Amino acid sequence: MSDTSNTPDNDGGKTAGGKPAAARTEAKAPPKSARRRSRELALQGLYQWLLNRNDIGAIQAHLHDAQGFNKADREHFDALLNGAVREEARLTAAFEPFLDRKVEELSPVERAALLVGSYELVHCLDIPYKVVINEAVELTKTFGGVEGYKYVNGVLDKLAAQVRAAEVAARR
């Protein structure tokens, strides 16, 4: 009299958690949104521009031809890249009071992420400030140094409290 339905060799087609054996496959990461892809490409363009101040039109054209650009929100990408370059001085002046070092001492990735996040906080009022900050943090985690995302988070959180005071107050 043996019951083989739940032995280690025969788990009845289920995992230890009771899930069907077919559910044992690795979970795939959700596909990136078009806006996230546009932010990634804008960050890459700003990085190139910050390093060598090449013509932004040439950088933009190169990124339009980049693999995966067809999955990006082209309008948002163009607005981020061109807007951040056009308003670099104004955006930097907005977040600079919240830095604990000179702007020139920031890594190019941190600086580019701050420019993208600052531009969105100031100009993309349809995007909640928490989403703007989270997206900049994710960019920094993906492309930046080990702890850079914490710094970007802190700076943009303080900037959001200043430029979107009513929205921040309503959510806290």
Swiss-Prot record:
Involved in transcription antitermination. Required for transcription of ribosomal RNA (rRNA) genes. Binds specifically to the boxA antiterminator sequence of the ribosomal RNA (rrn) operons. Belongs to the NusB family. The gene is nusB. GO terms for molecular function: RNA binding. This is Transcription antitermination protein NusB. Gene3D superfamilies: NusB-like. Residues 1-37 are annotated as: Disordered. Keywords: RNA-binding, Transcription, Transcription antitermination, Transcription regulation. GO terms for biological process: DNA-templated transcription termination; transcription antitermination. It comes from Cupriavidus necator (strain ATCC 17699 / DSM 428 / KCTC 22496 / NCIMB 10442 / H16 / Stanier 337). GO terms for cellular component: cytosol.
